[in-house]
């Protein structure tokens, strides 16, 4: 579910006006629980890098801070086309700020919901943020897993989904 959000902040999407996050820098577009940082210099981490594919030096880059969009991934070409400052062309190592609960704690806190364990295809409209995904997992009732579910569709809008993020696991 994070992939369409990242795709929406690429310079090419912004330049082509094909993004549901167009003109949203420094605006609240997600829940306070959403803090996402690009950490390209994590020691011994897969994907760590000091330069992006264009040779631009990487640095720690806040992407979302408490639901506020802080940056786009602007490559050299897009920066020149839009007259914007380049950042880096693509994410390195994205880290989300941990919440306080483990998976069992998250499940126990839900009266009625669904634990999604897999996706069975689907799509997201990059301009509007509307999505539809096939999901499978387990029904949660009164804080406990009650029965498996499959062949179910989850539909909605990315801005609404991320604005309603209630918890992040640890």
Across the structure, where does each feature detected by a protein language model lie?
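Active-site pocket-lining segments that scaffold enzyme catalytic pockets across diverse folds
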Residues: 1-21
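Dual-mode signal for accessory low-complexity, basic/Gly-rich regions
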Residues: 24-170
């Amino acid at each position: 579910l994070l992939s369409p959000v990242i795709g929406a902040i690429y310079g090419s999407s912004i330049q082509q006006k094909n993004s549901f996050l167009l003109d949203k820098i420094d605006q609240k577009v997600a829940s306070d629980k959403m803090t996402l940082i690009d950490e390209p210099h994590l020691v011994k981490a897969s994907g760590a890098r000091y330069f992006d594919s264009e040779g631009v030096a990487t640095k720690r880059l806040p992407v979302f801070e408490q639901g506020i969009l802080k940056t786009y991934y602007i490559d050299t070409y897009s920066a020149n086309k839009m007259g914007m400052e380049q950042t880096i062309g693509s994410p390195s190592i994205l880290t989300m700020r941990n919440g306080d609960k483990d998976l069992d704690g998250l499940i126990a806190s839900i009266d009625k919901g669904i634990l999604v364990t897999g996706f069975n295809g689907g799509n997201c409209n990059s301009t509007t943020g509307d999505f539809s995904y096939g999901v499978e997992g387990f029904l949660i009732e009164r804080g406990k897993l009650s029965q498996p579910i499959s062949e179910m569709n989850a539909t909605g809008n990315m801005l609404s989904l991320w604005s309603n993020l209630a918890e992040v696991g640890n």
